């Protein structure tokens, strides 16, 4: 059996925070605002995985009203989500990830993001695609107010 999940997340830029996207620290003058480390890409991956197994969203599992998740490492949150996926008996077929940001340029960091996501999802790098696009200076991402990410995952019931 196959299951598809789709995830989407948005965070706004603020001064004084590190910029972490896809588990990679990116040198930039601003970071993303959030209760956790605000890793917009890993949040979208987590939501896609949760959606594929019908388990709600990251807000339900890691509420921003819970102090345990203040400044949480999103890689740890995704690792927990992946353990739920594995408990349901699924493995990753593939993940297709899109980062939407005017700045900074993501190209230098894409391969490392793929490596991080593949490791967290117990997959090969070839099963994870990460790409970035701009909105041609339109909307909040175009005005450099924040970053968005969308992710689609395909899971398959494990034979093991």
From Swiss-Prot:
Keyword Lyase present in the record's keywords: the answer is: yes
Please provide, alphabetically and separated by semicolons, the GO molecular function terms listed in this UniProt record. Answer: 2-C-methyl-D-erythritol 2,4-cyclodiphosphate synthase activity; metal ion binding
Instruction: Please give the superkingdom of this protein's source.
Output: Bacteria
Pathway noted in the entry: Isoprenoid biosynthesis; isopentenyl diphosphate biosynthesis via DXP pathway; isopentenyl diphosphate from 1-deoxy-D-xylulose 5-phosphate: step 4/6
Family matches, as SUPFAM superfamilies = IpsF-like
What are its E.C. numbers? Answer: 4.6.1.12
Name the positions where 4-CDP-2-C-methyl-D-erythritol 2-phosphate binds.
9-11, 35-36, 57-59, 62-66, 101-107, 133-136, 140, 143
Cofactor(s) demanded:
a divalent metal cation
Which InterPro entries does this one have? MECDP_synthase, MECDP_synthase_CS, MECDP_synthase_sf
UniProt entry tagged with the keyword tRNA processing: no
Where along the chain is a divalent metal cation bound?
9, 11, 43
Catalytic activity field:
4-CDP-2-C-methyl-D-erythritol 2-phosphate = 2-C-methyl-D-erythritol 2,4-cyclic diphosphate + CMP
Annotated Pfam families: YgbB (PF02542)
Q: How is the cofactor bound?
A: Binds 1 divalent metal cation per subunit.
UniProt keyword list? Isoprene biosynthesis, Lyase, Metal-binding
Return the Gene3D superfamilies for the record.
2-C-methyl-D-erythritol 2,4-cyclodiphosphate synthase
Give site residues, Transition state stabilizer.
Answer: 35, 134
**GO BP annotations, alphabetical order:** isopentenyl diphosphate biosynthetic process, methylerythritol 4-phosphate pathway; terpenoid biosynthetic process
Q: How does it assemble?
A: Homotrimer.
Similarity field = Belongs to the IspF family.
NCBIfam families xrefs: ispF
User: What this chain does, per the record?
Assistant: Involved in the biosynthesis of isopentenyl diphosphate (IPP) and dimethylallyl diphosphate (DMAPP), two major building blocks of isoprenoid compounds. Catalyzes the conversion of 4-diphosphocytidyl-2-C-methyl-D-erythritol 2-phosphate (CDP-ME2P) to 2-C-methyl-D-erythritol 2,4-cyclodiphosphate (ME-CPP) with a corresponding release of cytidine 5-monophosphate (CMP).
Known PANTHER family for this protein?
Answer: 2-C-METHYL-D-ERYTHRITOL 2,4-CYCLODIPHOSPHATE SYNTHASE, CHLOROPLASTIC
Q: What is this protein called?
A: 2-C-methyl-D-erythritol 2,4-cyclodiphosphate synthase
